[in-house]
Amino acid sequence: MITHEVERTLAELSSTGSSAKRICLVSWNGNPAKLDLRVWRTVDGETKPGKGVTLTDEEAETLLAALTDYFG
């Protein structure tokens, strides 16, 4: 069984109905938290992770550099 703990929500990018796309710091299976971009769904009052991507610090820094270059 995969476990998760959202340690901090950095931003909510969008939401529709019972789902929201968020950037969070998430610990998976008791490991150190990593940056996580994912859709979170609320089902029967419980928030569950949907499809997404987890990034190491190095990957997040590379993404930040690429976005900064793209947006100027």
Predicted regions and their residues:
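Positively charged, low-complexity terminal tracts
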Residues: M1-G72
